[in-house]
Amino acid sequence: MAINKAVSIDTAFQTIMQELRERSARFLGTKQAVSEEKAEFDCPYCKDRGIVVYRVHKDTSWHLDEQLDLMVPDDMVSEDDFLLGKVCTPDKASEWKDTYSKQCECVRRKKIARLMAASGITEEFEKLLFGNFITDGKPDMIKDAYECAVEYYKDFQKIKGERQNSIALLGQPGSGKTHLLTAIMNNLIKKKSVHCMYFPYVEGMGDLKANFDNLEAKLDAMRKVEVLFIDDLFKPINGQPRATDWQVEQIQSVLNYRYLNHKPLLISSELTIDEILDIDEALGSRIHQMCRDYIVIIRGDRMQLNHRLGDWE
């Protein structure tokens, strides 16, 4: 009897060990399958569906998210964890039948990446932010330009459909005009998902003329984009503005459309409004009207205002 009892205990032990090995194999197999599945997707969280699903316990409280205008659970667990058995035992699964879904963060990241790619901003320009614009020890006009740019960005949502919905930073080259307007663009794209376009006047005009077959399509894109940044408008060469009749005509066609349809502009130029008015009064007056509430003209000692000549960096 003692021998039979020992055999029974040994058999039971072997059975238990076999069950444990099978459970371990199933668990490892599931983990491997999940790992392999994750590797197949750009986003392991939503599996490229754009939606993340959560399980909510039946006793969980819900509250109103005023920003989303939706009822949101106070606590939740991922669908994947629930299906892997990490949340509860099978007999308790019915307590987790409620679900809550929300857009995956990858959707916003992909949209921002598309907007950045379409904007024409280079990787180097992506680094131009308000936070790395130096104002300490700089002339008041530089500080005024910075404050104007920040204020414009903060006001953008409430003014974007108004007549005075644009900004112009004018005057001294090397004073940070492009940096500040690019910082506005970067923030509009990354934080507000606004479709923006960067148009460097000299290079852009050369491209328009060189690709005449695509001229109208490119001008149409400039007319209709949510926010257009024209950098170095009519940039002078040898003291004379680059403003041929053809160049003025193209800029006029873009600005007229944007003026009539209340579409915001960001403009930098070495010229003042008076100097732009001398080139084309209708064009200059519209720029002035659109930018009236957010305009800074930087004039003075170039050694103090031009960071390429001074010791800004």
From Swiss-Prot:
Domain of life: Bacteria
SMART domains, per the entry: AAA
Annotated Gene3D superfamilies: P-loop containing nucleotide triphosphate hydrolases
InterPro entries: AAA+_ATPase (IPR003593), DnaA_dom (IPR013317), P-loop_NTPase (IPR027417)
SUPFAM superfamilies cross-referenced by the UniProt entry: P-loop containing nucleoside triphosphate hydrolases (SSF52540)
Single GO BP term: DNA replication
GO terms, molecular function: ATP hydrolysis activity
Pfam families reported for this sequence: Bac_DnaA (PF00308)
Family: To B.subtilis YqxC and T.hyodysenteriae hemolysin TlyA.
Protein name: Uncharacterized protein YqaM
Annotated source species: Bacillus subtilis (strain 168)
Lineage: Bacteria, Bacillati, Bacillota, Bacilli, Bacillales
